[in-house]
């Protein structure tokens, strides 16, 4: 853990916003061509079900996920999945604080940002109108489609939560169901509080699904226990549609202990 000090910005308007897009930056060492329309449609359809390509040109490709319908007061329409053309990746905006919380890629993160000069951006649109569980599974399926479409990519960066993964870790995982979103779309951050023995752990990424993120303020405990607890609680909240109400208890971090929420 770095001893570098960071000051919390309580007025951050640039961080993840509730219901914001699930934005994936696919990173490359060399430029890549966009796969042809037929290939993209077939691969995305294999992962998410019935798909219609409504846009394909030199700038982007757009796909309607016809089995995932976003409903609004004035109508309904399929969720849209967008894939942009390959463009330069300048690595801007990844400050020391963001880098410090990339726990899944600690040994490779600096090399990735140094060597990767190109990116493809993929994102969803209108998915915020879906139920949380459906939204999570759709985003996870869309990620797996991108991993198949771009076999030469080096890494994936998930803007909604600040996680960075080597491409091989995305392709080789054995996780199923909505826990795929927890793995790639939710980050658990860790902080030491200056001048005290207190520690703080929080989650980032649940708000993408309009679900609550978590925060733990503690001391005299192994932070790894708390990290695991946070991931387990996040998974439970997603799988069961946020069933925990204010004042209720959940299993605590320590054995035979309950925590009030």
Language model features by range: what are they?
Residues 84-187:
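Internal, hydrophobic cores of structured domains that mediate oligomerization or house catalytic pockets
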Residues 32-111:
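N-terminal low-complexity, intrinsically disordered segments
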Residues 1-47:
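N-terminal alpha-helical "arm" segments
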Residues 28, 32, 127-135, 218-225:
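Conserved aromatic-histidine-acidic binding/catalytic patches
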Residues 45-56, 141-156, 236-245:
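Structural alpha-beta junctions
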Residues 17, 136-139, 226:
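Active-site-proximal structural scaffolding
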Residues 159-261:
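Aromatic/basic-lined ligand-recognition segments
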Residues 14-17, 109-119, 198-209:
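Short, compositionally biased low-complexity segments
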């Amino acid at each position: 853990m770095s001893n570098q000090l960071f000051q919390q910005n309580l007025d951050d308007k640039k961080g993840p916003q509730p219901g914001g897009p699930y934005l994936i930056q696919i990173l490359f060492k060399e430029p890549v061509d966009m796969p042809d329309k037929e290939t993209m449609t077939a691969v995305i359809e294999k992962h998410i079900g019935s798909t219609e390509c409504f846009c394909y040109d030199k700038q982007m490709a757009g796909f309607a996920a016809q089995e995932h319908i976003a409903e609004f007061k004035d109508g309904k329409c399929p969720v849209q999945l967008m894939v942009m053309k390959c463009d330069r990746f300048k690595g801007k905006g990844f400050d020391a604080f963001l880098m410090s919380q990339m726990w899944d890629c600690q040994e490779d993160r600096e090399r990735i940002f140094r060597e990767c000069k190109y990116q493809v951006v993929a994102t969803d649109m209108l998915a915020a109108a879906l139920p949380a569980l459906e939204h999570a599974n759709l985003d996870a399926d869309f990620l797996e489609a991108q991993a198949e479409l771009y076999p030469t990519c080096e890494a994936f960066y998930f803007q909604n939560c600040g996680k960075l993964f080597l491409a091989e870790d995305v392709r080789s995982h054995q996780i199923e169901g909505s826990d795929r979103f927890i793995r790639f779309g939710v980050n658990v951050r860790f902080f030491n509080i200056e001048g005290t023995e207190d520690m703080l752990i929080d989650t980032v990424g649940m708000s993408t699904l309009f679900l609550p993120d978590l925060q733990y303020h503690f001391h005299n405990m192994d932070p790894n226990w708390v990290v695991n607890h946070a991931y387990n609680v996040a998974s439970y909240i997603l799988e069961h549609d946020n069933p925990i109400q204010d004042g209720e208890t959940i299993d605590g971090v320590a054995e035979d202990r309950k925590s009030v929420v």
